[in-house]
A protein has these predicted regions:
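Nuclease catalytic cores that cleave nucleic-acid phosphodiester bonds
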Residues: 8, 12-155
Length: 155
């Protein structure tokens, strides 16, 4: 006689929450869907939320990033702006999305990592380090993220 054990794995949304502009949107939508949320941030980005579990890590160059990667599992959704975090989360079987609604996939992560490396090398070569920063976030940006995120939640 064989016994088949079905293990139910619940998806969790894990947010690399240091300076993430879509924490509230993702948390609200996850709550509607009944999906747990974990927000990971360092001590300089304290969050308060009645639904999400907040993981506060020490300040450090990769503390939050490594916690996100170590926490995620196959089937989870990871929200991050960091290509390195996305690459490691994808390797663990997580689905990854950035704050603009772009999906990180096995098909695009290598080229994104290569572009990041090239841009970093160019910045090191240049004596001018004038970084403009991201453009101001709009309601359309939030809507684009929301649409893509809902699509991931419903997979």
């Amino acid at each position: 006689m064989y016994v088949i054990i079905h293990r139910v794995i619940q998806m969790t949304v894990i947010i690399d929450a240091d300076a993430c502009p879509v924490v509230k949107i993702a948390t609200a939508e996850s709550k509607k869907a009944g999906v747990p949320v974990i927000c990971v941030c360092d001590t300089s980005h304290i969050l308060n939320d009645g639904y999400a579990r907040i993981m506060i890590v020490d300040k450090g160059s990769n503390s939050a990033d490594l916690t996100v990667v170590n926490t995620c599992q196959k089937g989870d959704i990871v929200i991050t702006q960091d290509y390195g975090v996305a690459s490691m989360a994808l390797a663990k079987g997580a689905k990854c999305i950035n704050q603009n609604g772009m999906y990180y996939t096995e098909d695009n992560i290598d080229s994104l990592m290569a572009m990041r490396h090239i841009a970093s090398a160019e910045r090191r070569k240049s004596s001018k380090h004038h970084l403009k920063g991201p453009k101001k976030r709009t309601a359309e940006d939030d809507e684009k993220f929301l649409k893509a995120f809902i699509s991931l939640l419903n997979i």
